UniProtKB/Swiss-Prot annotation:
Biased composition (Basic residues): 262-271
Organism of derivation: Styela clava
InterPro entries linked: Rbsml_uL18_euk, Ribosomal_uL18_C_euk
Gene3D superfamilies in UniProt: 3.30.420.100
Positions of region (Disordered): 251-295
Keywords tagged on the record: Cytoplasm, Nucleus, Ribonucleoprotein, Ribosomal protein, RNA-binding, rRNA-binding
Encoding gene per record: RPL5
Primary subcellular site in the record, as a coarse category: cytoplasm
Pfam families named in the record: Ribosomal_L18_c, Ribosomal_L5e
Described purpose of this protein according to its UniProt entry: Component of the ribosome, a large ribonucleoprotein complex responsible for the synthesis of proteins in the cell. The small ribosomal subunit (SSU) binds messenger RNAs (mRNAs) and translates the encoded message by selecting cognate aminoacyl-transfer RNA (tRNA) molecules. The large subunit (LSU) contains the ribosomal catalytic site termed the peptidyl transferase center (PTC), which catalyzes the formation of peptide bonds, thereby polymerizing the amino acids delivered by tRNAs into a polypeptide chain.
This protein's name: Large ribosomal subunit protein uL18
Database matches in SUPFAM superfamilies: Translational machinery components (SSF53137)
Localization, UniProt: Cytoplasm; Nucleus
Family: Belongs to the universal ribosomal protein uL18 family.
Amino acid sequence: MGFVKVVKNKAYFKRYQVKYKRRRQGKTDYFARKRLVVQDKNKYNTPKYRMIVRFTNKDIVCQIAYARIEGDVVICAAYAHELPRYGVKVGLTNYAAAYCTGLLLSRRLLNKFGLDEIYEGQTEIDGDEFYVEDVDGKPGAFRAFLDVGLARTTTGAKVFGAMKGAADGGLDIPHSTKRFPGYDDESGDFSAEVHRSHIFGGHVSNYMKELEEEDEEAFKRQFSQYIKHGVTADTVEEMYTKAHAAIREDPTPKKKTDFAGKTKRWNRKKMTFSQRRDRVKQKKASFLRAKQQEG
């Protein structure tokens, strides 16, 4: 079939149908969403859970959600900006931070449903593949499917770091090792040691050492926050090791405290009825005084 020019006549505009709003905005891939949301017909009202991973310039968002007609329902969420509470104060958007955020999400979710003691996940992190298995006589493992949105799913992408953290934390997420750092596409071999290095920030510490040797000014400029918080290339792995242990110890979200400070008010406070009445009396009195002085 050759090229057919679209004739934009009355019939074209009469039958024209706009795409969904979030497709027009370029925010949702509905081809992928349909497959992530639609549940098997023989499972009736059972929700199909998704592990949603999104990256901003300064944060990582991990959520467990399921779809309803009214909109998606988020049952649990974890953010990279919570990591300073667990000792990770710098590099909140790298691969190691993504792993920590995924681990925090899974431990928080299992704690919420009372499954954290049944499914502990991978306590000794080695970077190798790990799949949680159902325990006989106990509730099944919590199953979720990775939702990466519009992110590119290249080998070594950070979204898979968050997924690996959640899988090691005890969630049942179907996956393979083909997209983890350390996988060689040509030979098909997977190096768990390389992946473990990324989980503990080894790639960051290696770059810190290289940059410090080559250009100290550039090192001070790029790693200024690391220097400020006393994090060196040799202490990066220790920082993440302690963070993993702290997350497992207490994954619950921090309770919001009531605002104790004094609020600033920039506009005038609304007057009461009695205040308005007195104001009118004062204006009348001042007007009469001015008239008397003129007379």
